[in-house]
Amino acid sequence: MLIGEYKHVVDSKGRIILPSKFREELGERFILTKGLDNCLFGYSLKEWGVLEEKLKKLPLTSKEARTFLRFFFAGACECEVDKQGRVLIPQNLREYAGIQKEVFIIGVMTRIEIWSENNWLKEMTNENLSVDRIAQKMEELGI
């Protein structure tokens, strides 16, 4: 399971060091794509396959489904972790997520999310993150 929050610096070539715990889960090669909320999603090849199977079931007759699939798959790329534990984030994905110098890499169960420092700090101060609101939502979900 991918959990935790790590802050890292993007080097001059657009690479970041993946935390070792994430490298163990993701493997030497993994899929990186545009995520929701202006971050990037990273999936192990196995998890990507599971997700792909679910997404294949979306109806092609639905404009929303086609739009989502284009967004999600057109931005996807297979990344390789080098011997130093670094991975190159392609320029188009860095631009999409607003990534410049510092990033937060977080684990969210079956995927990682890579956030620009600015977007992550905004997300963490979002009014929806109040403890009372989260507790209420957990209760509604039966958690």
Swiss-Prot record:
GO terms for biological process: negative regulation of DNA-templated transcription initiation. It is found in: Cytoplasm, Nucleoid. Residues 5-47, 76-119 form the SpoVT-AbrB domain. InterPro entries: MraZ, MraZ_C, MraZ_dom, MraZ_N, MraZ_sf, SpoVT-AbrB_dom, SpoVT-AbrB_sf. Pfam families: MraZ. PROSITE patterns: SPOVT_ABRB. Keywords: Cytoplasm, DNA-binding, Repeat, Transcription, Transcription regulation. Transmembrane segments: none annotated. The keyword Cell membrane does not apply. One of its GO terms (molecular function) is transcription cis-regulatory region binding. Its main location: cytoplasm. One of its GO terms (cellular component) is nucleoid. It comes from the Bacteria. Belongs to the MraZ family. PANTHER family: TRANSCRIPTIONAL REGULATOR MRAZ. NCBIfam families: division/cell wall cluster transcriptional repressor MraZ (TIGR00242). Forms oligomers. This is Transcriptional regulator MraZ.
